[in-house]
Every structure is written in C-alpha cells, then in structure tokens.
Design a protein with these regions (language model features):
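Conserved catalytic cores of very large enzyme subunits
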Residues: 86, 93-515, 536-537, 541-703
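Core of folded catalytic or high-affinity ligand/protein-binding domains
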Residues: 503, 515, 519-522, 721
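Short, mixed-charge aromatic SLiMs
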Residues: 43-48, 64, 547-561, 723-735
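Charged, amphipathic alpha-helical regulatory modules used
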Residues: 1-100, 105, 722-728
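Contiguous, well-ordered alpha-helical segments that form the cores/surfaces of helical PPI scaffolds
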Residues: 519-532, 553
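Short alpha-helix boundary/capping elements
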Residues: 64-71, 228, 534, 710
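Long insertion/accessory domains within large nucleic-acid-processing enzymes
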Residues: 689-737
C-alpha cells in the first residue's frame, strides 16, 4: 500500500503515522481512547489501496464523526486546518507575497514602478499571484513548461488571466471630434489648443488604465493642428475688439468666415492688419508655450497606475508642414528643452519621437528643417527626442495619409500591416502581446560553451529553434482566446469612446478591435547565443554575424507564415527586456552555472545589440546592427553611447542620424549620454557624483533604461545597473572629421 504525498512523491503507507495523528487529537481534548484510535487505523490499513494524504485524512474525520468522540473529530479538523494554513504560509507563493507586502524584496523589474510604495507593494503581490495562476492553472502544460524552463518568456504574465492587451496608438481625431466620456461624466470636444493639451493628458491617463503597455499619438502635430487655429481665432477676435475697436457683430462676422473657410493662421485675411495680427500671434505663441509645458508636467505627475506609475506615453511629431502643425511640433520641442519643475529637470515622459523624412525635414532646403535643428538642440540637452526614419525601406507610407507615417511607441513598438482592412494605418491599433524567445538557452544546449562538443550542433539548434517558434505561435493563440472573449465593458473608456479601431462593432466580445493589433515574437540575447554556439559574438566575426542574421530573418519569415495560417498580424520584435535581461540570466545560471561571456555578466544583451562592453566606433556599431533592423518590423531601436561633451557638436550629431537613416536604412535611433542634476542647486551636466557649483553629493544621475529614461539609474534592477556601468562610450573609439 502506497501514499501519494502532496508534492507528488509516492511513499510506503505508515500505519503508525495515522495512529499518532488520532492520539494527538484525542490528547488535546483529554479524551484518549487508544482502542478507537487503533480500530480506525486498522480499518484504513485494510483498504489496501493507494491513496493520497487528503483521502486518508478525510477517512479519519469521517470515522471520528461516526463515533461517540465528536470532540476528538472537531479537534482533528482544527488541527488539520491549522496544518494546512501552516503549509500554505510556508509555500513559495505566500512567502513571496509576504516579502512584497513588507517591502523587503525590491526587484525594480520596471523602473517606472515604485515597489516601496503601498500601491507598488500591492501591485507586485497581486502580480505574483496572477502569474502563478496563469502558469499552473490556465496555460497548456507545454507552454507553461517552456516559460518555466526558460525557452520563452510571457511578458506581463500577471495580465494573462485578465485578457488585457499591451499598447495602443490612440485615435485622437475621433475623441476630439466627438468628445469622450468617463465613468463619472463626459467631456466636450476641445475648442482651444490649451484645452486640447489638457485632454491629451487625460485621454492618455484613462487609456493607460485599460491596458498594460504604452499609450501614444502617432502624429501629435496632425492631431492638434486644428486647435491651433481655434485658439488663434479667439486671440484674433480679442485683437479686433481691443486694438481694432470693432463691435461684437463685426468680430462675429470676421471669425465666422475664418472658421467656415478653415483659414490658416498665416492667411492674408489675418495678416492684412499687422497690429492685430501681431497681437494674435504673440498671444497664440504664449498659449502654446504654456500648454505644452502643462502637458509635459501633467504626463510626469499623473500617477494613475499602481506603484506610483505615470502613463507610459509617447508622442510622434515633425511631419506636418502646415503653420499650425509646425507650431505644435515647435511647442513640444520647446517644452522638452525647458524641462520640468523648479530646476527644469529632464522630463521622463512623454517619449518624444521626431519623425525624420527627406523632403520634409531631413535636409536644409526642406520646409521643416528648422524643426529638425530644434529637435537636435532638445536631444543635446534632454536625450529626447528619439528619431524615427520615415524613409525606412519597410515603412510603407502613403504620403497622403498621415495615419500611415512611420511612428513608434513605448520602448520601440512598431505597428505593421493589418490583414483586416486597415493596411499600414496605425491609428487606433496597437500590440496585443509580446512573447520572447530566450536565444542563449537554445544555444547553450547545442553550442560549444559547455565543453561537450568542439563544433556547434547547428542542425540541433535549428530543430529546437523551430520547435520553440511553433510553441510561441500556440502560446499567442491561447492568450488571444482569453483576450478576445472579454466584454467591451471591461474597458469602457476604450470601447465607448473609440480610442481603438472598430470599437463600435464590439458587442459581446472585443475580437473585432483586437484583430487589427499585432502579436509580437520577440528575441533576446543574440550576442550570448553566438558566444554559446561559436565562442564569439556577432560583433567579432563576420561569419558568426551572418548566422545571427539568419536567425532573426527566420523569426520574421515565421511571423509571416503564422499570419497566413491564422489570419492575424504576427510580427518579429527586438524585445526591450528591461527586467527580462536579469530574469532570463538568473534562469540560465541556475541551470548551467557561470559560462564566460554567456552567463558571466549580470544581464543578457538586448535583442541583436552589439554588447555594451564591445569597444567599437559609432559608425561600426551602426553598421553591425543595421542589417538586423530589416526584420523586426514589430519594433527595434539602435543606440549610440556618447560623451555629454560630444552633444555640444550638433553638426556631428546630425551627421550620425543622417548616416544611420540615409546610408544604413536604420528605422529608429536614440543617442545616450549622461544627464546629471544637482538636486540642491539645480546645476546640470555630467557631475561624477559631486556638484562643482555647491559641493552637494545629492545628485540625480539620469540614464536610459531600455527605450525610456528614468529619474536615476540606481533605481534600475540589478541587471540594468550592471549594464549601465559597463556601457562603453562609442565616441572614445571614433575618429571624427
């Protein structure tokens, strides 16, 4: 006779344990009846069949209740419940939750979350519970095991059971044309630029509550250009009244005509009266300046998610050549340069993204070239804006449709082709979910790094890699079943207000909207994969680099195949891996130990990036990474690390951007350099721990974590902190003319 333990182990039945458990219960109520205890023990023994522990305890309870010893039965039940609670209290999940609640286990997996705060602790504790439910009770066994074994990683696993989606480009035209409603009221359409800027922040905040990733505008200049006109008309009307001394009826006629014709703010209809026009423009510029500053301050102070998070916001701009659109872009860049707060510190959000395009802003004779120069000025001081390439070979823009213009959100997400009628339009679309393949895990098993073989087993690698790709496809489809089954009532702001496409078609489920979104197949650790397979990374050897490129190309091909099979939008994605860089590394160390240049550092290298420790020039880094950028159409980014003093040479900075976009076809570029602020006097430059002005060591050291900034790099998780300290400045290895 055997007993199945709670942990699944099978052991021989021990009658003494049954007898002793009954005697303990009897002793606790001073009613010791050894004969009854032996009788019950013998009856259980005579069943002579395999049982689990709970079945045996149920039999003891039932037999005690059937006897005259009801008090003993009650004592046994209490004892059993106490033991159950003790076991649960000592379980890994409960211990994890208790640690979260105490604020002692600070992981900083997301630099935008304050894990020390009450709401941050609550968020992380809830997250631990939801993750365990998803892995142990919801997912298919093979998918759960692949996650636990470290082959794949489900991002934001705590949202799996809820069916939330990741990120979205909001349809601002829709909500600003019709207004929008929230749970406690409704909002009229804005009638001025200042009101529109306030409502952008409100809409971003409300949308962020019904998803777990970033919220963005794919063309803020186009979204807000009409409100520049509305504000100008008001200021011009005031000028007519106070300078022109016109009566109300005359002013009403002038403005009515302007509105009917939707006249531009530079139309000669207005410029004819120089004094009134100058007044109106001056007041408009002042309003734009204050409104943009207000937007930036709001987006850095509206803590609307658990853990004191602000909405993860991104704004794209720079393409609208109308006077109104240009003023929107200028206002945003001026606000970025000005900074926030009493010390004019660099704003963390929004991630501002300048939409680079030849014929629009790339070259000196382009109409918006002055905005590019202003963007470079902002970049040199604030790290933002990033630059996105409208001329990228995979952009597929329609020059007559701004909704198709190249844009990114969050750390790097791009939204590609929609098979369900929207084509390359991005507005009202986003990403449903990313799942990342841990490439070094497969490579360790088939490479030379463990010493089991002298030559990599490439066939074995490809077989396993394709097996994992198929598993990722299955995992996406399983999660989508949960997502599409949700009611629109789960996200009323999004579905009632039409921030997402085809929300009006969603009645009992949200499939009609979510089908337009993408399913990202991500990857991490190309460098460590190559090292594990061949003993070199892709920055060190051309042949190794070609193999690495074939792996990423295969993900892209598989995404296309999965799109065809399922009539959904799969994409290849260069994963940001903020917390995953450390989580995946720890899993590999647990399984394989320390392997030089594979698991020997405290992080894995993001996507296909050249390892941060490699001493390469600016242009070599760009040239190495550029071929990879063709394939992750779901999003990628290229970084360059620079000295802060280098940023004073704006022409050199512009040359880097032009070379990356015009010569190398890189889609998305960001330049990194240190920004330090003395929090006692506000002095800003690279301070190296001490302020030269006031001597304070109360220094904020701002760095980029993945695609976004955070207030101080010491708030990153341990993996990202280690990476920051090992980042090589590529300027040190570059000869500049």
């Amino acid at each position: 006779m055997e007993v199945i333990k709670r942990d699944g182990r099978i052991v021989e039945f021990n009658a003494d344990k049954v007898f002793n458990a009954i005697i303990k219960a009897m002793t606790s109520v001073n009613n010791c009846n050894t004969a009854l205890a032996q009788k019950i023990t013998d009856e259980i023994t005579r069943t002579n069949c395999n049982m689990n522990v709970e079945t045996i305890q149920d039999m003891i309870e039932n037999k005690l209740m059937a006897s005259n010893c009801k008090d003993v039965a009650k004592a046994f039940i209490i004892y059993r419940n106490d033991r159950t609670k003790e076991r649960e209290r000592n379980s890994s999940l409960i211990q994890k939750v208790l640690e979260r609640n105490s604020g002692k286990n600070i992981q900083n997996s997301n630099a935008n979350v304050d894990e020390r705060s009450f709401s941050g602790r609550e968020k992380e504790a809830s997250s631990d519970i939801q993750k365990e439910i998803a892995l142990d009770y919801i997912m298919s066994k093979d998918i759960s095991n692949a996650h636990k074994d470290g082959y794949i990683y489900h991002h934001d696993l705590d949202k799996y059971n809820l069916g939330m989606h990741n990120c979205l480009f909001l349809d601002f035209y829709n909500i600003f044309t019709n207004g929008f409603s929230t749970r406690n009221g409704d909002v009229r359409p804005p009638t001025s630029f200042s009101t529109a800027c306030q409502l952008v922040a409100v809409a971003f905040q409300c949308q962020s509550q019904v998803q777990y990733g970033g919220v963005a505008s794919c063309h803020l200049d186009y979204d807000l250009n009409s409100f520049i006109k509305f504000s100008f008309y008001k200021h011009y009307a005031d000028g007519c009244k106070y300078i022109g001394h016109l009566n109300d009826e005359q002013i009403k006629t002038i403005i009515a005509y302007a509105k009917k014709k939707s006249l531009s703010i530079t139309d000669e209809y207005f410029t004819a009266d120089e004094e009134i026009y100058t007044y109106a423009i001056d007041m408009l510029v002042k309003e734009c300046e204050q409104s943009a500053q207000g937007l930036y301050h709001n987006l850095n102070t509206l803590e609307s998610r658990q853990g004191s998070q602000v909405p993860f916001t991104s704004i794209n701009f720079g393409r609208d050549t109308s006077p109104e659109g240009r003023l929107v872009s200028k206002s945003m860049l001026d606000a970025s340069i000005d900074g926030i707060g009493k010390f004019h510190r660099t704003s963390i959000f929004p991630i501002s993204i300048f939409q680079y395009k030849q014929g629009v802003n790339a070259n000196p004779d382009d109409p918006n070239y002055d905005l590019k120069q202003l963007a470079l000025k902002s970049l040199s001081k604030r790290i933002y804006p990033n630059f996105v390439n409208g001329d990228w070979s995979q952009a597929h823009e329609d020059e007559n449709d701004p909704d198709t213009f190249m844009a990114t959100m969050g750390c790097r997400t791009m939204i590609g082709y929609d098979r369900h009628g929207l084509g390359y339009s991005k507005v009202g679309r986003g990403n449903n979910n990313p799942i990342t393949i841990i490439l070094p895990k497969i490579a360790i098993e088939y490479g030379i790094c463990t010493g089991k073989r002298k030559v990599a087993n490439i066939d074995g690698f490809w077989n396993k890699f394709n097996e994992i790709l198929n598993l990722v496809e299955k995992a996406h489809l399983e999660r989508f079943e949960i997502m599409k089954a949700q009611s629109p009532q789960a996200a009323p702001f999004m579905y009632n207000n039409g921030t997402i496409k085809d929300s009006d078609k969603c009645v009992d489920s949200v499939y009609e909207s979510l089908k337009h979104n993408t399913f990202a197949i991500g990857y991490i650790g190309v460098a460590e994969m190559c090292q594990a397979l061949f003993g070199k990374n892709h920055a060190q050897d051309d042949t190794v680099r070609e193999f690495a490129l074939s792996v990423i190309k295969r993900i892209n091909e598989f995404a296309s195949e999965a799109s065809e099979r399922n009539n959904l939008n799969f994409s290849c994605y260069a994963t940001p891996a903020e917390g995953l860089c450390r989580t995946a590394l720890n899993n590999l160390r647990d399984q394989y130990g320390i392997i030089e240049n594979v698991t020997s550092r405290d992080y894995l290298t993001n996507s296909h990036h050249v390892p941060v420790w490699e001493k390469v020039s600016i242009y070599d880094k760009l040239r190495i990474e550029a071929p990879f950028c063709k394939y992750p159409t779901g999003g990628c980014i290229t970084y360059i690390e620079l000295e802060s003093t280098f940023m004073q040479n704006l022409k050199a900075v512009e040359d880097i951007i032009d070379y990356a976009f015009k010569e190398l076809d890189i889609p998305y570029l960001a330049l990194n350099f240190p920004i330090d602020t003395c929090l006692d006097c506000g002095y800003q430059e690279e301070l190296n721990g001490k302020c030269p002005k006031c001597g304070s060591t109360n220094i904020e050291e701002l760095r980029r974590v993945t695609g976004y900034l955070t207030t101080d790099w010491h708030k990153f998780n341990a993996g990202k902190q280690a990476e920051v300290q090992e980042r090589v400045k590529h300027t040190a290895y570059t000869e500049l003319s």
